[in-house]
Each structure stands twice: as C-alpha cells, then as structure tokens.
Amino acid sequence: MIVLEDLVRDRGSRYAASGGVVSSRAEIDAFLAALRRRRKFDKATHHSWAALLADGPMKNDDGESGAGAVILKMLEREGTQNRIVVVTRWYGGVHLGGDRFAHIVTCTRAALAALRDAADGSP
C-alpha cells in the first residue's frame, strides 16, 4: 500500500491518495479496511476509489459525487489493471465546487506515478 498524505490543501479541505494491488472485490474491501485502520484516515470525510479488475471496472464515490468516475477514467486511460486508487478528503467546511475535481485529478496522478515507481522498483 502506498499512501501520499497532504497532497492538496484548499479552503480548509485536505486531500491524500493511496494505491495498491487488488484483484477482487474482497481485496478492495481489505485495502479500504486497512486504510481506515490508520487513525488519521478513519476520521476522513470521503474515501472515493476506483479499480480496474479482470471482472470489470469498480468505483465508489463515498459521498463525493462524481469522484469515483474521475478516478476510474484516469485508470482506464492509463490501462492500469488490478490496481486501486483511493482519494481521501477531509472536508474543511467550504464547498469547493468544480475545483474538487482538479484536486481529485492531482491526487490520482500522484498515486498512479507512485504505483508505477513501485512496480519499476524506483525509490
């Protein structure tokens, strides 16, 4: 599991990204449970995620409308199979409107780069 904390801060909201290898819904559930076991992440407002599995794509907005679709589209564009990307948000009290999608893209890009580096053995 890779975890990239404090990637974006905007109007009180904070974003992080996580990623890892998964091949089934059960592994997705285990990944999300492991992430939530981290005290800081357990207190987050949203854990939006997407994964491309052999059985097909899966996503969940976790209350952040449209977020899962944005993450999934980026996974599909990259052709990333059997990986999950989770974008976590701690809501800061101010609605961000469409800016939140730019933050989701930024976090997803960072997670995908970290997953590529991990697969390549890069530091």
Name the predicted role of every residue range:
Residues P57, Q81-N82:
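Hydrophobic alpha-helical segments and their boundary regions
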Residues G66, R89-P123:
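Active-site-proximal loop/helix of nucleotide/amide-processing enzymes and allied scaffolds
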Residues M74-Q81:
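Short glycine/proline-enriched loop/turn "hinge" motifs that connect secondary-structure elements
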Residues V70-I71:
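Well-ordered alpha-helical segments embedded in enzymatic catalytic cores
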Residues A51, N82-Y91:
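Glycine- and acidic-rich phosphate- and metal-coordinating loops
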Residues M1-S65, L75, A113, D117-D120:
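C-terminal regulatory domains involved in ligand/effector binding and gene-expression control
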